[in-house]
């Protein structure tokens, strides 16, 4: 069982989408179920509407799930599991205040040591715990042995008990911490493999320790994906526009192109242009590079152009939404436009009213002739016919003609454009 477990706290990051895609691919390859779990226990940071947005984005990428969970709905199980650990003396109530802990952290900092919980409340007698009326958290006792696990990308990893520490699993408001809720949910939902970003590596031994303490002995496998760097080689920030999947989609980049690029990023693929369905046949999670991958927007745009060309004409016409059969013309314009947004702008420039500027007179002459001109198969025949009838020459012929046909003074060679624009010439002459 594989899962994707986003939080509804902001726009979906491309790193999260990459994890979703990889989990989905591996689930399909292993013929296993795929879980979508919304981790919404951080109520203060949750944003209304983001849960639905996550589902909408996954649907756009053709990522389907067999099971859907809301983490906060498992709260009763989180509390039951925490109580079980306390009753078995594997966890304990900690009454240390934030101020007390902060003072100890400052002292450790001054001494040049890493702060570790000193066990102040671990050995409190039961009667002392019962009689104490202060707010408390629940801490899981640190493991007594080295925690080891295998990562498909990073290999064998191990963590010593002192580096895991006795960590908090339940807050004073009786809600679970991220690691506890995540570990319990993975256990309850029979997750067998976790693919996520490498920023979660330090969480893995804690989650392994939680499940082991609860007597869960089913093996879990992992793959921690390297971080995505920006074009300057620095970890990509959520503040950078193109780190947002929503921004990429709104910019006119196709879901299929984004998926193609994210699968290829930091990975050796048998070909450069492919679909998600094709990738399922050959993708190997263990072949993903350990090194951070640098995001290249230009490369993504190049891939997007290829995916636009791959779209069926009727589907592209629906996307362009101009009530015309413009797909062949739009695909021709991928030499200048890299996104659906840019293509729409190109098409609108062609089919909207135009500013003729200094060529007002010449454009009027040409438009009258173009209304009924014979649409020759060959551009040279078309051009010569129009030259002869208009008596215009050079710049005063070609510039006005380009404006009428494209709405711009610059663009592709008219001879190259002609086969794609030919059937619209009579219409353009009447705009």
Curated annotation (Swiss-Prot):
It comes from the Bacteria. GO terms for cellular component: cytosol. InterPro entries: aa-tRNA-synth_I_cd-bd, aa-tRNA-synth_I_codon-bd_sub2, aa-tRNA-synth_I_CS, aa_tRNA-synth_I_cd-bd_sf, Glu-tRNA-ligase_bac/mito, Glu/Gln-tRNA-synth, Glu/Gln-tRNA-synth_Ib_cat-dom, GluQ/Sye. Keywords: Aminoacyl-tRNA synthetase, ATP-binding, Cytoplasm, Ligase, Nucleotide-binding, Protein biosynthesis. GO terms for molecular function: ATP binding; glutamate-tRNA ligase activity; tRNA binding. It catalyses: tRNA(Glu) + L-glutamate + ATP = L-glutamyl-tRNA(Glu) + AMP + diphosphate. A motif ('HIGH' region) lies at residues 6-16. Pfam families: Anticodon_2 (PF19269), tRNA-synt_1c (PF00749). A motif ('KMSKS' region) lies at residues 235-239. Belongs to the class-I aminoacyl-tRNA synthetase family. Glutamate--tRNA ligase type 1 subfamily. Monomer. This is Glutamate--tRNA ligase 1. The gene is gltX1.
